């Protein structure tokens, strides 16, 4: 028990209780959609009566409660129950006079009365255990007390005999009452004769000291927040002091009976159906309850003190009690019984007991009550459960979040966002201000000591005048309540915003952007559509905020654009606006508003004080009234003038001073005590503000309370000075000179500011000061902006004074010990060179500078570096006249003082003097030469012209000279340098502007140019298809024309073919014929294979296979050869026209000095001219020969199977062709638009020139083949070209390069121009000879003696039909004509090995692999692979072919 009572002041919370509380909260959690269920309420805890510390005599047990048995009839009416309770209380008080009885302390003055009981034997609400009435007078018999005890025992037995039923099946009130009865049964045993040693109840922690209540830290929130005095808006009752007596002497006749109040209380049958109705119903209950409390206090003031009970604050701080009370509140009427009003008068009795002497009876009762003050847990339940006139279960009440305790009501201060204030209830007010006047008004005015206490109060009030001043000055913010206590709260809520606004003027814009939703509705739209009542200030506030945000946003944009200066221009001066009548009227209204406010405060204070005086006088006894009266009399009407002196000399309280007390000087009177300061209007400060600072001259008048509204004051100089300092509210004055109103603040001063103070630099002034001349910055000045004036140099004292090294007064000692520094030149710097001495400008020295130089040399002992640094000006730009180098200073000093005789003879100084003399002589010689030359020019000019002679410019010397005044041209040089720099910058700027203009123009032009639409792949495919269709159409037309011409020519020559074939097939022909090959198989001359009769088999000509296997045709002019483009059908045919193909001989031996075959030799313009001339002649000859042809033989078409047979027979050719032909045949595209065929030598023997010419003429080959001769500016597509060299037999060369190389070898000393001219002549001769040969070859070809049968190597697309004119014979490769441009040519990596197959411009020419040997391929037999490479060529040269065909 000792350990349990030791913690009486702590909050009761154990693990079991926390578990029950958590279970209850989870079951009624409104956030989970659950409603309040009373069945989840845990059982209430009962609190035991602490053990008795001092028990003298065992007395009759005082019952703590009077329960009603559920088996008996309903309880009696209210008056009867009240009378019985009074008797029980009286008997208990009588026993307390003689002995100390430990009893539970009462909570309520009046016990609760049980109402009518229902027929189902439900327990009625009963009194809480531990509630007892104690009276100071015994007027009740003892048997009634015994009867009450017997009834208590019966009620306990009946209660215990009831069967246990589930809580869900019982009525909430029934369950609650049974829990209470159970607790009561445990608390008070029925067979115990006395309460001397009671048993503990549920281990309740009690107070260890008598008279000290158990404090609970937290007051539980009431579920019905406004149903009683202990709602969440009402603070917990203030605990009484341990030393305060809890009882007082009150006569029994002054005890107020609750009959009159209870008679007016009726049970409310209203049941709310909506949450709003529930809130309004609770608010009405709260208002009515407060009205009853106030009326009860007023009634108690007239009947005497109402405190014979004390409220103990050790109420359980649990939600269980609150929920039980909430459940029991369903049977409570809207108007509570007087038990809930009684605590309000309790503190007054506690305070009153301090000043009243206790009688023996009162002391005995006080001791009985102050032993222990405990309250049973059913106290609040008893308050809430009153008698119910209507039996039966009450209708269910709507459960809301407020009623269930999930949320609580907010006070008006919380809703308005004001600083939280501790509410002062009427219960706490006597504790907060404990004044004797309060106790006098509480009902002790009948005491004989009241007047004396009133006089003591005056002295106490005089002491209160030492508080801080509460004078309110104009233009001063009204101090809010509790300034000192609420500083932290304000700092947390609003000080941060104010701090941000002071530091950053853009804070308003930031808040507007931060709290305004980006896509939400603006505040303006919300205000325009608001459903609440809005004033003009609300709209103006939003308008002002919008205007500020617009201004700040503009400022923010200008700041980012570097266009917002920190200092703004001052507003332009405008004439002041003349004041109008409206301004005067507004000024009158302002000061009248202040006057009326202050006057109203004064009237309120005066009326309150007068009312308090009247109340005090009425409630006082006759003796006190005599002390309160003012000794005055009504002056007679005949002598009104006598009142003045009498009132002037009389010392009276301020209550009688009806006139102005300030006009009469008399001593400070004793002020009449006024009422409490809490009832003053809210506009006036209730208490002295501790936040106000001391005034300049603190005086008593500034520390008066609010109730002291009049006082007397001596008109001393100090008082007059104080009054003069007070603000005076007067209307605007009219200036006598201008007859205009003289305003304190101009009408436009509020908005017409000079500049907007957006930063600290806005209103600040920049002070300029005269700086000292710039000085040379020392190497020890580390700061860039440091100046000597701000940090003056302070000479530090030496650390050691016993060192005489740097002290000037010890210099003579140093000179004796150590000889002075000897004379020396500035040897640390090299001696000036002779060139510098000749070209330097003389330095100028004034007399003052010479003297300074002497003094420095003497002071620093020939330290020329230090002397130079002292004499060098501080400017960074040093002119020649101001040059002060160490050697310059030494030279000047030597010129003034002269060198010592011993030093001038040394070799060092001799060299120095010699260098200076030599430089001087050279300078003089140069000046003399320039002067002589100028004179000669003048003489020549005078002889020829009468021009004026130019003045001779004499150059000054190079040695330092003395001047009286040095003319400084440094500023001129600086200006010139600045001008040049500015001009340079302007030039650069102009160039940049010009470039930017050009760029802008170019950009505009480029933007205006229409861009071609971006074609899709489908568009490209469509264009390609259309182009191919056009090419096929043109090719088909051209093919039909060529077929018709061939048929006509073949038909015309049919009669001449047999004779020519006999001449060509003869084995014993002239040497110019092709040698006979005995190994060749016999060939018939018929056209069995589809060949025309005019074309014979090449094997019959005596040549192996007729032509080498690798001989191909390069298609240069498609309209001549009749080549077809890709994708179209091709009739492989060849015209027997002699001009259709020309064969060009190739030398059997290549010369080492000849150009490589794959290199172009047309680098010089002469070669190009020769090539163009040759191409022109060839074109003329070709046209002439084509026109002379009478007819052509038709060419039959070949079938695709024959083409396949031809391909299969190709690799089966005998190897003798490789042995016979060892040259490198190449077909080169020519600009003459006809194919060229390079014919190698046969079997290493030189070919006959006549035969080669015949072959060339018969094959339609033109010679010489040249690059870059394509018409219409189309370059030669192929990088490889055949470069046939000169024949070993001396045949005519066929290329310009070979002709030139041959001429240069024969004539090495011949100039290049002659070589070119001779080359051109030989070329013309060659062309004439070839023209003659062509006519002969044409005749032979027409006769069929020379069968030049090309092999058309077909592609594998099936559209190309080759010609098989001979079985096993060589094929001439003809590619497909592709429609590619030469620009789309892709270089092949294998051009050396594959020219005709992989996209080479040679278009299918079979090219042998080049030999790796140094031996020319033309001299090696069997080294050439004659096999052709199948495949269609993708040469870009076919584009030019298609163009030619289209032409």
From Swiss-Prot:
GO BP term, pick one: DNA repair
Boundaries of every HSA domain copy: 569-644
Domain Myb-like: 841-899
Gene Ontology cellular-component annotations: NuA4 histone acetyltransferase complex; nucleus
The keyword Coiled coil appears for this protein: no
Region (Disordered): 60-271, 300-443, 636-689, 923-970, 1003-1023, 1180-1248, 1381-1447
Main location: nucleus
Record localization: Nucleus
Highest taxon in the source lineage: Eukaryota
Keyword annotations from UniProtKB, A to Z: Activator, Chromatin regulator, DNA damage, DNA repair, Nucleus, Transcription, Transcription regulation
Basic and acidic residues bias spans: 332-342, 428-438
Biased composition (Polar residues): 150-173, 219-230, 305-323, 353-369, 379-389, 1231-1248, 1408-1447
GO molecular function, one term: chromatin binding
Annotated Low complexity bias: 231-247, 925-940, 1180-1230
Assembly notes: Component of the NuA4 histone acetyltransferase complex.
Similarity annotation: Belongs to the EAF1 family.
Function: Component of the NuA4 histone acetyltransferase complex which is involved in transcriptional activation of selected genes principally by acetylation of nucleosomal histone H4 and H2A. The NuA4 complex is also involved in DNA repair.
Name used for this protein in its record: Chromatin modification-related protein eaf1
Lineage, top ranks: Eukaryota, Fungi, Dikarya, Ascomycota, Pezizomycotina
Protein encoded by which gene: eaf1
């Amino acid at each position: 028990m000792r350990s349990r009572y030791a913690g009486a002041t702590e909050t009761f919370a154990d693990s079991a209780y926390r578990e029950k509380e958590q279970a209850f909260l989870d079951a009624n959690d409104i956030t989970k959609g659950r409603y309040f269920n009373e069945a989840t309420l845990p059982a209430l805890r009962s609190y035991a009566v602490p053990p008795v510390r001092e028990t003298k005599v065992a007395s009759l047990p005082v019952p703590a409660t009077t329960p009603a048995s559920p088996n008996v009839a309903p309880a009696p009416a209210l008056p009867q129950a009240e009378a019985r309770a009074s008797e029980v209380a009286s008997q208990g008080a009588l026993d307390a006079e003689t002995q100390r009885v430990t009893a539970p302390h009462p909570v309520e003055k009046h016990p609760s009365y049980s109402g009518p009981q229902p027929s189902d034997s439900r327990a009625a609400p009963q009194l809480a255990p531990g509630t007892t009435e104690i009276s100071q007078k015994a007027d009740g018999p003892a048997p009634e007390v015994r009867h009450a005890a017997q009834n208590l025992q019966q009620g306990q037995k009946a209660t215990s005999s009831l069967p246990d039923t589930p809580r869900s099946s019982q009525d909430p009130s029934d369950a609650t009452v049974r829990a209470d009865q159970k607790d009561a049964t445990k608390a008070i045993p029925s067979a115990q004769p006395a309460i001397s040693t009671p048993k503990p109840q549920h281990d309740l922690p009690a107070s260890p000291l008598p008279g000290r209540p158990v404090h609970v830290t937290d007051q539980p929130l009431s579920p019905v927040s406004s149903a009683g005095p202990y709602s969440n808006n009402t603070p917990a009752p203030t605990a009484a002091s341990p030393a305060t007596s809890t009882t007082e002497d009150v006569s029994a006749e002054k005890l107020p009976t609750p009959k009159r109040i209870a008679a007016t209380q009726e049970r409310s049958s209203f049941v709310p159906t909506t949450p709003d109705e529930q809130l309004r119903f609770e608010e009405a209950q709260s208002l009515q309850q407060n009205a009853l409390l106030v009326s009860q206090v007023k009634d108690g003031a007239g009947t005497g003190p109402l405190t014979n009970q004390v409220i103990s604050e050790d109420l359980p701080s649990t939600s269980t009690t609150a929920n039980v009370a909430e459940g029991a509140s369903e049977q409570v009427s809207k108007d509570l019984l007087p038990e809930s009003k009684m605590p309000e008068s309790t503190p007054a009795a506690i305070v009153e007991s301090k000043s009243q002497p206790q009688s023996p009876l009162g002391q005995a009762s006080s001791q009985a009550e102050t032993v222990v003050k405990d309250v049973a847990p059913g106290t609040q339940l008893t308050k809430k459960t009153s008698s119910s006139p209507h039996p039966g279960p009450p209708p269910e009440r709507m459960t809301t979040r407020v009623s269930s305790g999930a949320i609580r009501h907010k006070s008006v201060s919380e809703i308005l966002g004001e600083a939280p204030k501790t509410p002062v209830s009427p219960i706490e007010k006597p504790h907060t201000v404990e004044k004797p006047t309060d106790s006098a008004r509480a009902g002790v005015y009948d005491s004989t000591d009241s007047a004396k206490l009133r006089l003591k109060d005056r002295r106490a009030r005089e002491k209160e005048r030492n508080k801080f001043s509460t004078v309110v000055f104009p233009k001063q913010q009204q101090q809010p309540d509790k300034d000192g206590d609420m500083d932290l709260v304000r700092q947390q809520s609003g000080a941060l915003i104010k701090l941000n606004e002071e530091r950053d003027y853009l804070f308003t814009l930031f808040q507007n952007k931060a709290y305004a939703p980006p896509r939400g509705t603006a505040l303006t739209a919300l205000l325009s559509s608001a459903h609440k009542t809005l004033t003009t200030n609300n709209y103006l506030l939003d308008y002002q905020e919008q205007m500020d945000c617009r201004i700040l946003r503009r400022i923010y944009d200008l700041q980012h654009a570097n266009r917002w200066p920190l200092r703004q221009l001052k507003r332009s001066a405008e004439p002041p606006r003349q004041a109008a009548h409206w301004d005067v009227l507004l000024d009158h209204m302002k000061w009248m508003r202040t006057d009326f406010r202050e006057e109203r405060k004064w009237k309120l204070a005066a009326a309150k004080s007068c009312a308090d005086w009247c109340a005090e006088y009425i409630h006082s006894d006759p003796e006190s009234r005599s002390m309160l009266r003012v000794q005055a009399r009504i002056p007679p009407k005949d002598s009104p003038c006598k009142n003045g002196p009498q009132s002037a000399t009389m010392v009276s309280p301020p209550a009688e001073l009806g006139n102005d007390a300030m006009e009469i000087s008399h001593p400070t009177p004793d002020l009449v005590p006024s009422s409490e300061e809490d009832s003053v209007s809210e506009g006036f400060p209730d208490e002295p503000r501790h936040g106000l600072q001391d005034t300049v001259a603190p005086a008593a008048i500034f520390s008066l309370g609010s109730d002291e509204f009049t006082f007397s004051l001596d008109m001393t100089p100090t008082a007059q000075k104080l009054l003069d300092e007070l603000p005076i509210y007067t209307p605007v004055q009219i200036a006598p000179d201008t007859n205009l109103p003289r305003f304190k603040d101009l009408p436009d001063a509020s908005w017409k500011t000079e500049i907007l103070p957006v930063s600290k630099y806005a209103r600040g002034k920049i002070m300029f000061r005269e700086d000292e001349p710039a000085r040379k910055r020392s190497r020890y000045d580390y700061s860039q902006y440091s100046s000597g004036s701000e940090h003056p140099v302070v000479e530090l004292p030496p650390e050691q004074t016993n060192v005489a090294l740097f002290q000037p007064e010890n210099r003579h000692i140093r000179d004796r010990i150590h000889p002075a520094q000897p004379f020396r030149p500035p040897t640390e710097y090299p001696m000036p060179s002779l060139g510098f001495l000749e070209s330097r400008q003389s330095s100028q020295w004034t007399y003052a500078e010479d003297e300074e130089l002497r003094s420095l040399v003497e002071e620093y002992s020939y330290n020329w570096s230090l002397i130079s640094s002292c004499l060098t000006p501080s400017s960074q730009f040093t002119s020649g006249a101001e040059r002060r180098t160490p050697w310059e200073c030494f030279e000047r000093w030597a010129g003034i003082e002269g060198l010592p005789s011993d030093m001038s003879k040394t070799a060092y100084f001799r060299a120095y003097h010699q260098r200076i003399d030599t430089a001087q002589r050279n300078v003089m010689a140069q000046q003399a030469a320039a002067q002589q030359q100028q004179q000669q020019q003048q003489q020549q000019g005078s002889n020829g012209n009468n021009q004026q002679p130019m003045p001779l410019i004499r150059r000054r010397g190079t040695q330092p000279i003395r001047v009286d005044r040095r003319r400084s041209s440094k500023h001129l040089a600086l200006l010139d340098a600045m001008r040049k720099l500015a001009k340079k910058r302007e030039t650069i700027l102009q160039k940049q502007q010009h470039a930017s203009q050009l760029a802008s123009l170019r950009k505009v032009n480029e933007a205006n140019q229409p861009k071609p639409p971006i074609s899709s792949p489908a568009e490209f495919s469509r264009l390609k298809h259309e182009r191919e269709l056009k090419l096929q159409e043109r090719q088909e037309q051209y093919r039909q024309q060529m077929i018709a011409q061939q048929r006509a020519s073949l038909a015309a020559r049919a009669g001449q073919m047999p004779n020519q074939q006999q001449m060509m097939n003869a084995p014993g022909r002239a040497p110019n014929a092709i040698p006979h090959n005995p190994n060749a198989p016999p060939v018939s001359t018929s056209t069995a294979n589809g060949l025309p009769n005019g074309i014979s088999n090449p094997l019959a000509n005596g040549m192996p296979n007729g032509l080498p296997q690798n001989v191909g045709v390069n298609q240069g002019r498609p309209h001549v050869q009749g080549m077809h483009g890709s994708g179209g059908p091709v009739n492989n045919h060849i015209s027997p026209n002699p001009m259709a193909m020309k064969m060009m001989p190739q030398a059997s031996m290549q010369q080492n000095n000849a150009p490589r075959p794959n290199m172009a030799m047309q680098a010089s313009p002469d070669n190009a001219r020769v090539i163009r001339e040759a191409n022109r002649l060839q074109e003329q000859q070709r046209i002439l020969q084509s026109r002379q042809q009478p007819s052509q033989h038709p060419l039959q078409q070949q079938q695709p199977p024959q083409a396949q047979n031809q391909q299969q027979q190709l690799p089966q050719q005998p190897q003798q062709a490789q042995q016979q032909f060892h040259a490198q045949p190449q077909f080169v595209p020519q600009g003459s638009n006809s194919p060229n065929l390079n014919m190698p030598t046969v079997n290493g023997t030189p070919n006959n020139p006549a035969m080669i010419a015949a072959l060339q003429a018969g094959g339609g080959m033109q010679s010489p083949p040249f690059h870059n001769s394509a018409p219409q500016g189309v370059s030669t597509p192929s990088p490889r070209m055949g470069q046939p060299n000169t024949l070993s037999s001396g045949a005519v060369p066929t290329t310009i390069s070979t002709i030139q190389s041959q001429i240069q070898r024969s004539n090495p000393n011949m100039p290049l121009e002659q070589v070119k001219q001779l080359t051109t002549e030989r070329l013309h001769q060659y062309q004439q000879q070839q023209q003659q040969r062509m006519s002969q070859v044409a005749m032979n070809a027409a006769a069929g003696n020379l069968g030049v049968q090309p092999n058309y190597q077909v592609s594998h697309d099936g559209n190309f039909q080759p010609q098989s004119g001979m079985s096993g014979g060589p094929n001439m490769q003809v590619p497909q004509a592709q429609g590619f441009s030469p620009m789309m040519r892709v270089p092949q990596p294998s051009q050396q090995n594959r020219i005709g197959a992989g996209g080479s411009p040679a278009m299918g020419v079979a090219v042998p692999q080049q030999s790796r040997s140094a031996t020319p391929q033309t001299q090696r037999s069997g080294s050439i692979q004659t096999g052709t490479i199948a495949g269609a060529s993708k040469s870009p040269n076919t584009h030019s072919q298609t163009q030619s065909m289209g032409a």
